[in-house]
Amino acid sequence: MDQSTTQIYKRLISYVGAYRTVAIVAIIGMIGYSGMDALFIQLMKPFIDEGLNERNADVLKYAPFVVIALVIGRGVFNFMSSYCLSYVGSQVVRSLRQELFEHILHLPVSFHDKNSTGDLISKITFDTEQVQQAITKALLIVVREGAFVVFLLAVMFYTSWQLSLIFLVIIPLVAVIVTVVSKRFRHISKSIQSAMGQVTRSSEQMLSGHKVIHGFGGQNQEIDQFSKVNNHNRQQRIKMDATKALSVSIIQVLAASAMAVILWVVSMPSMIDTISSGDFVVLISSMMMLLRPLKQLANVNSDMQRGVSAAQSVFLILDEEVEKDTGTVSVDKVKGLIEVKNVTFKYPTKDEPVLNNLSLTIKAGESIALVGRSGSGKSTISNLLPRYYDLEAPSEILLDGIALHDYKLTDLRRQFALVSQQVVLFNDSIANNICYGLQREISQQELEKVAKQAHVWEFVKDLPEQLNTMVGENGVMLSGGQRQRIAIARAILKDAPILILDEATSALDTESEKLIQQALEALMKDKTSIVIAHRLSTIENSDRIYVIDNGSVIESGDHLSLLANNGTYSALCKMQFGEQG
């Protein structure tokens, strides 16, 4: 639902509550700064009328001291407002960015399926930075220049309320212009944020896929793609600047027109004798000085609308419902009995179900394998077990006789160790990647033991920093096989009662695969193991093999019995082993 600017700004200002005292000091500084400028104009009257016109040197000799005092006061108030407002703005943006980061971490996997990484990165980095513009620069100008306008109008009315009324005629016209332009700014600001998301997404795609781009000669394609989104971003910013320039020009023409009318009225014989030289100078100076704050107030509208639009996009993410954790059952370690009952499931972004009334049972400590062609639903089962997605009745998965949704999420996910074909490593040391998410302290000896079990130590021992070696972004400094061994070491260290091996040895050479297979067999002992594999040679020793096609189990049994059936599994074996032969 589209929220009004006022609602969004109120919600944004609520973040200032923790820094209320500093914010009040900033507001006092802004008002004081404007007061010094207005007071300087007002003091021109006695200096002109009593000092110059009456040739009174006693009045004029105070002028230098007054000017110095006003400039010093102005400087003090300027520092108060600028520093305190910058402090509040940076703290609010830090809090908002931290809250957004933490909230995204707790959103369900289905949310990430529907939102691109580039767009989310843009919200965390670019949009939150735009919010600071609404809090600091915009608020500074609105309060300080707004107060200056009020003070100048007060000076004008005190000097000549009749002439000041003429100037007030333009206020409703300015208000209409600001209202119309605000809607335009808000619309363009949303387009700018969307365009920046496209720029970030295109950049992220280029950086993460640079090897494929080089390998397939796709540089020109990526250049054209980025050029389009980059130019679209430029067009939106030009629209913003054009709207800003037009609105400022119109407001300045209106103000100048009002000033011209006042000068014409003052020139009339009936008026020329009613105001003194000092009154005239104060009045004209006030009107001239009004042009600056009116221009800045018109300009700041774009910054404010840009910040409000950015805040709205951030709040839309913050209003997304976090992953539901309705479970009440706590458990340290399960036995590992898994019962999949009549499961039909489709991904939120898909129209057709991936699993169709699928049922299977995995006994505690049993090693089972899931085989089938790509897209048959094997990996979906591994996504459902840790409850990355929720099932709808009557579909149900039980763990030790208890439905998955009855377990507390943290306790449930502690029961699974996943080694996937797509290994995710963080830009940290090998040791920290192996220990990722571990809730206990670990000794160097234990860490090295795990590294040796997973055959990580073989390529680490000769490195200068050994386990403290940095792996680079997503393990770019390592080979595919080395990354997979680190993932296996991570699973060994977690020591979960249920193992999910999704093509866990697919990136390994034959020699490494044999070594890892030995480590996995030792690891799988006394654990419930689910092996998803295309290479059937890795699953021959499984207690039970389930053949899945179109989301349903079409065959099950051990390796020898399935071969004897001469069914789908037998055909797959003949095809693979025939190719290998």
From Swiss-Prot:
Catalytic activity: ATP + H2O + lipid A-core oligosaccharideSide 1 = ADP + phosphate + lipid A-core oligosaccharideSide 2
Main localization category: membrane
EC number(s) given by UniProt: 7.5.2.6
UniProt cross-references to PROSITE patterns, sorted A to Z: ABC_TM1F (PS50929), ABC_TRANSPORTER_1 (PS00211), ABC_TRANSPORTER_2 (PS50893), MSBA (PS51239)
SUPFAM superfamilies linked: ABC transporter transmembrane region, P-loop containing nucleoside triphosphate hydrolases
CDD domains: ABC_6TM_MsbA_like (cd18552)
Domain of life: Bacteria
Chain segments annotated as transmembrane: 21-41, 65-85, 138-158, 161-181, 246-266, 271-291
Purpose: Involved in lipopolysaccharide (LPS) biosynthesis. Translocates lipid A-core from the inner to the outer leaflet of the inner membrane. Transmembrane domains (TMD) form a pore in the inner membrane and the ATP-binding domain (NBD) is responsible for energy generation.
Similarity section: Belongs to the ABC transporter superfamily. Lipid exporter (TC 3.A.1.106) family.
Subunit description: Homodimer.
Protein name (record): ATP-dependent lipid A-core flippase
Native organism: Pseudoalteromonas translucida (strain TAC 125)
